[in-house]
């Protein structure tokens, strides 16, 4: 599903597009308004996720611009130790930031055709890919574990109010220290 505009945002976008007429958008507001109307019209898309295996090498594919963090999640948990993640295969559904990225903002989190999938899309796509990797390998995914190495210890010694381990696999979580 796409993150479609609410009625207030849609009304604003439609009014702005009516005023604009047939000319190309002149500014970011007009471009954003055009994107909101497009998301409203499309509502949803089909995201094709695939996995294949060649010997002991696994390949997971997504039709999105997959973040490095997502690729690392897939590689870390893949049942096969040699795993590649290919993006923009069989489609171009735009950026899929992990849910925690939405809290940080940025152009890749704006609801538009190039990043309009719902906020939960990344964990759902990741889970689908892992399930497919299990199917093609005939093995269960590997479990991950947090390390307690010197870098982690130095963070704790600094006495942060909260910290983010950057190894969480299913969404945003700040841990009180």
Task: Enumerate the language-model features and the residues they cover.
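Non-catalytic substrate/cofactor recognition surfaces at enzyme active-site rims
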Residues: 1-150
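Short, tryptophan-glycine- and acidic/Ser/Thr-enriched carbohydrate-recognition patches
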Residues: 165-177
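Secreted glycan hydrolases and related glycan-binding modules that recognize and/or cleave
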Residues: 150-151, 170
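Glycine-centered flexibility sites
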Residues: 91-94, 159, 171
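N-terminal helix-cap/turn-to-beta initiation motif at the start of protein domains
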Residues: 152-158
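Loop/turn elements at helix/coil->beta-strand transitions in domains of secreted/extracellular proteins
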Residues: 80-83, 158-162
């Amino acid at each position: 599903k796409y993150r479609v505009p609410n009625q207030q945002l849609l009304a604003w976008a439609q009014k702005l597009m009516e005023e604009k007429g047939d000319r190309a958008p002149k500014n970011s507001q007009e471009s954003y308004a055009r994107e909101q109307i497009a998301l409203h019209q499309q509502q949803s898309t089909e995201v094709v996720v695939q996995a294949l295996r060649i010997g002991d090498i696994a390949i997971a594919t997504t039709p999105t611009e997959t973040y490095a963090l997502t690729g690392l999640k897939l590689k870390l948990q893949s049942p096969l130790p040699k795993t590649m993640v290919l993006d923009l295969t069989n489609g171009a559904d735009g950026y899929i930031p992990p849910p925690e990225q939405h809290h940080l903002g940025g152009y890749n989190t704006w609801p538009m055709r190039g990043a309009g999938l719902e906020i939960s899309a990344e964990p759902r796509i990741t889970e689908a890919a892992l399930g497919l990797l299990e199917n093609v390998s005939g093995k269960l995914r590997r479990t991950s574990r947090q390390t307690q190495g010197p870098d982690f210890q130095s963070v704790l010694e600094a006495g942060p109010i909260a910290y983010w381990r950057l190894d969480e696999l299913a969404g945003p979580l700040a841990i009180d220290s």
